[in-house]
From Swiss-Prot:
Region (Disordered): 1-20
UniProt-recorded name of the protein: tRNA:m(4)X modification enzyme TRM13
Superkingdom of this protein's organism: Eukaryota
Gene field: TRM13
UniProt catalytic activity: cytidine(4) in tRNA(Pro) + S-adenosyl-L-methionine = 2'-O-methylcytidine(4) in tRNA(Pro) + S-adenosyl-L-homocysteine + H(+); cytidine(4) in tRNA(Gly)(GCC) + S-adenosyl-L-methionine = 2'-O-methylcytidine(4) in tRNA(Gly)(GCC) + S-adenosyl-L-homocysteine + H(+); adenosine(4) in tRNA(His) + S-adenosyl-L-methionine = 2'-O-methyladenosine(4) in tRNA(His) + S-adenosyl-L-homocysteine + H(+)
Induction: Induced by salt stress and abscisic acid treatment.
Disulfide bonds: none
Organism taxonomic ancestry: Eukaryota, Viridiplantae, Streptophyta, Embryophyta, Tracheophyta
Length: 250
């Protein structure tokens, strides 16, 4: 005889939300939404119920923006949003630049000229199971041959190590693995002679000859902050097209 199906325990009601927090309950995370509610509602803009129904009604559906899936928009506003999406305007402005050449860094080479990403995906979906397995084996062999020529190099300088120790008791908005990666990037830069040892930069160089750092795709600026704190570099230029929260002040 088979086992009787296990009885599921009735789910307990969610606790009351903390003050000043959206009332929407996230069952997978077992907590309320961390956003601030709108002045006229108990919910934030992402979880606002339909104005035509009560608070217990289903929420309006959010869908990814087709221009940039990193943000979402209400489904009923999608058509209007696409026409005025700021990222669409940014992409159009970038394409209008005289130096812009679409896909120039995509690594097309001799065999991939003129083939779009969508066409490549379509070809992969048409593969049989055996063809897909053979393709995966080729990729594994190519990776193994390339990986043999690479070596791990995890270097952390004394200046960066002291900096990280001083951050232990601070509430920093980034994870430990990220700061160790950035410390190793700086350590390898010093090993290759791209940086002078901590403290020597500010002492040996005058104001006119002071080094400068330009970081493209700087994100929130954590890597450059470590450079500024550990190496006394004051001339920093951060380039980032996206608008991030929790950006550091250097």
């Amino acid at each position: 005889m088979g086992r009787a199906p296990a009885k599921r325990k009735p789910s307990s009601p969610p606790p009351p939300p903390p003050p000043g927090r959206c009332h929407f309950w996230l069952p997978n995370k077992r907590r309320h939404c961390a956003n601030t509610p709108l002045p006229t509602s108990q919910y934030c803009g992402n979880h606002l119920p339909d104005s035509a129904s009560d608070a217990g009604a289903p929420f309006r559906r959010l869908v990814p923006c087709p221009v940039d899936p990193s943000h979402t928009v209400l489904e009923e506003n999608l058509e209007a949003h696409v026409g005025k999406c700021p990222l669409k305007k940014q992409a159009a402005a970038l394409a209008a630049q005289p130096f812009y050449s679409k896909g120039i860094n995509s690594g097309g080479g001799e065999g991939g000229g003129g083939v779009t990403s969508a066409a490549k995906r379509a070809l992969v979906h048409k593969l049989t199971k055996d063809e897909l397995r053979a393709l995966i084996e080729k990729i594994k062999l190519a990776h193994a041959s390339a990986a043999m020529a690479m070596r791990d190099s995890f270097l952390v300088t004394d200046a960066c190590d002291n900096w990280m120790r001083n951050q232990v008791d601070r509430k920093v908005p980034y994870q430990e693995k990220h700061v160790t990666q950035q410390a190793s990037i700086i350590g390898n830069m010093e090993a290759f002679g791209l940086l002078q040892k901590g403290g020597e930069v500010a002492e040996e160089n005058g104001v006119k000859n002071a080094p400068a750092v330009v970081e493209f795709g700087a994100g929130r600026g954590y890597l450059t902050q470590m450079l500024a704190d550990c190496y006394g570099i004051r001339n920093v230029f951060l380039v980032e097209r996206r608008s991030y929260k929790l950006k550091l002040k250097i």
